[in-house]
Amino acid sequence: MSNPDFQAARLTVRLDAVVANYRLCQRLVGPASVSGVVKADGYGLGAVAVTRALAAAGCDTFFVARLEEGIGLRKVAPSARIFVLDGAAPDTVPALITHRLTPVLNSLAEIAGWSAAARETRSELECAIHIDTGMSRLGLPGEELSRLASDAKHRLEHLRVVLWVSHLACADDPTAKMNAIQLDRFRTALAMLPPAPASFASSGGVLLGKDYAFDMVRPGIGLYGGNVQHAPKNPFAIAAVLTGRVLQLRRIDRGESVGYGASFRAKRPTVIATVALGYADGLMRAIGNRGVAAIAGARAPIVGRVSMDLVTLDVTDLPPATLSTDTEAEFFGDAIALEEVAAAADTAAYEVLTAIAPRVPRHYTGAPA
């Protein structure tokens, strides 16, 4: 008979840590308000549980990327203001209105379309407007900004701008000159436009100081424990721990290989732990023969390739008392930082976190989920 409590892999989500990180942001940027960025299913932790925890802590504003995310979140946060970063493409306008979602408009064309919808519905529609200050992705570039500023009364007719938004390109590096350049550009843009609250800082921007806070900040990965500026001591509490269960322990002789491609060969008699976690679970394949895991706080190198459902560790030097088929190995969390995994995979902590697959159960602690 199968054990219903058995979980081969698990992502433990500490909702109290998410709330603690929210509180830290409040202390750092007050009196500016703090929203919650819960796009990509709350950076992989679970948007529903995270939103409920943040709402219980007093957060009343959330950001998502996709329309579908906003529709789902509305069921969880019926009275919250929910911004949709993707904007308002013509075919999304009816759903945005129906679900009371606030689009972050990214072009004059979107502004015109949203204004037309307001006229058709004979209502004043809320929006945020994104000003591109250097990312060159979404948002009004300089030429469109000038056109909006010169004819704002007409172009914004029937609209209520509740937020001017921009986004920092290099907030993870407090020494980057680009931060000050973008700050100056955003201030210049705001001086050209009708008054409304402004938002500039994401998690990294929160740590840049109150000059970057304006009226609202938008922390994302900081809420989830990311060390966004790679500080010697992470100011944010660890909110997610990824573990996999040891399925088998075996001893191999010197010269024997491990895994596909025989990419690892033992240089000594070696104890191998095979763990129920693989790239189908979101473990980065690139960390094979490069990354580490931890068992009872002791580090063990990943040896051989990461396969679809399994990964292998060299646990030869770990205390035998810590090793059994009941043992859990940590792949990020308390002993292994997200950023260390990202470095081993030559990627960003954001990808490590958001890559965790749906088949990995989320286990919530610290607050009602």
Place the predicted regions along the sequence by residue.
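Active-site-proximal beta-alpha core segment in soluble small-molecule metabolic enzymes
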Residues: 2-12, 17-20, 30-200, 213
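Active-site anion/phosphate-binding pocket segments in diverse small-molecule metabolic enzymes
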Residues: 2-22, 27-29, 69, 88-90, ...
